[in-house]
A protein has these predicted regions:
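N-terminal export/assembly segments and adjacent metallocofactor-ligating motifs
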Residues: 1-238, 275, 360-366
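A glycine-rich, hydrophobic/aromatic-adjacent loop/helix-cap motif
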Residues: 286-370
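Flexible, glycine/charged-enriched surface loops at secondary-structure junctions
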Residues: 104-108, 241-246, 293, 326-333
């Protein structure tokens, strides 16, 4: 290999799976990028997100990519910009932020972010040191709701830690892994072929993954919570729940039984447009499987819609009453990450400022109160 050519190991940045990749550079310029066969996670496979030509020409070396700060020249909306130095940009931004903080208090500034990769700790560190509690991102239409509702239900966030390869049944609820997460689909497909695992798909559309399912429920959009409650009702009504787990770990089961009874199969069928037979079949299939995983889904009721909160709670309850919490083949509750406090500087934000977070009183579970 030429002295000017080097191969570096990295992780693909385009989704949370972070597949291992090999990046080849020549004279400091990337000339090739491909999956790393030695990465135990993806074993050399990468999906269409990392199309080499699109990545290099459309992103890394795109001639329109900004490489230096631009400052607006003229009126807002005029489309005129002038290039300035990094020092000038930092100085002007800092001066403006300090002025806003002195005039209106640090909470006047709200920050936002994209999907988390590795840099979000810097984002929170900055906001905490600046003194503003008002920070957020796309998580409220992604899986932030799962992240706070599941701990409220059973003490941990586990729907992103499904045992895909150990489950006897995989339930993909509003999740098309063939199209959006091919690597995860590989594990599901392997499990189905090697262990005979079953697949249930809940999706309004006959998606790629729905076509592979043993049972597909073509749900009416926005009625996921009703379906989950209907399944809970069948499981309780037919005595299919895990008595040992419920007796040992669950509180309020009698109240749950009363609430679920308000959603008999016939009523749920009218709401969801799914036949009564399929609703019963899905409940029995999930409850009687030796193990079943129900990972979070973005296009079901999890991520958006007025019933998202109820859907997530109901799905969490489904996992619990069937004993699929923290067990092989179900959802696993992992210990929290141990980041040094200095990473986030949460302690730098006094309680007085935390109380000023927008929505603090209306949505305590999503604020510092929670």
């Amino acid at each position: 290999m030429s002295e000017n050519v080097e191969v570096l190991r990295a992780g693909c940045y385009f989704c949370h799976v972070r597949c291992g990749v090999l990046v080849t550079k020549k004279d400091g310029r990337i000339i090739d990028i491909k999956g790393d066969p030695d990465c135990p996670h993806n074993k050399g496979y990468v999906c269409q997100r990392l199309d080499k030509q699109r990545y290099l020409d459309g992103f890394v070396y795109n001639p329109n990519r900004l490489k230096r700060p631009l400052k607006r020249a003229g009126e807002r909306g005029g489309g005129k910009w002038e290039e300035i130095s990094w020092d000038q940009a930092f100085d002007e931004i800092a001066e403006r932020l300090i002025d806003l903080r002195e005039k209106y208090g640090p909470e006047t500034l709200a920050f936002t972010e994209g999907t988390a990769r590795t840099w979000t700790w810097l984002h929170y560190k900055f906001t905490n040191l600046f003194g503003s509690p008002n920070t957020g991102g796309n998580g409220t239409i992604c899986y932030s709701s799962d992240m706070w509702l599941e701990p409220c239900t059973y003490g941990g966030f586990c729907s992103d830690k499904s045992d895909w390869v150990g489950a006897d049944l995989v339930v993909l609820w509003g999740r098309n892994t063939i199209a959006s997460e091919p690597l995860l689909w590989h594990w599901v497909d392997t499990n189905m072929k090697e262990r005979g695992a079953k697949l249930m798909v809940i999706d309004p559309r006959c998606s790629e993954v729905a076509q592979k399912a043993d049972l597909w429920l073509q749900i009416r959009p926005g009625t996921d919570a009703a379906l989950a409650l209907g399944m809970i009702n069948v499981i309780i009504e037919e005595d299919l729940y895990d008595h040992e787990f419920v007796d040992e770990w669950c509180y309020g089961f009698d109240q749950l039984k009363e609430r679920a009874a308000e959603y008999p199969v016939e009523k749920v069928s009218e709401i969801t447009w799914i036949s009564s037979e399929k609703i019963r079949e899905s409940a029995r299939m999930y409850a009687t499987a030796p193990s079943a995983c129900l990972p979070w889904g973005q296009k079901g009721g999890d991520a958006s819609g007025i019933n998202a909160t109820s859907t997530i709670r109901a799905k969490a309850i489904l996992r619990a009453i069937t004993g699929n919490i923290d067990r092989k083949g179900g959802e696993l509750i992992a210990p929290p990450s141990r980041f040094p406090p200095s990473f986030y500087e949460h302690y730098a934000l006094p309680q007085e400022q935390r109380d000023k977070m927008i929505g603090n009183d209306r949505f305590p579970g999503l604020t510092y109160k929670g």
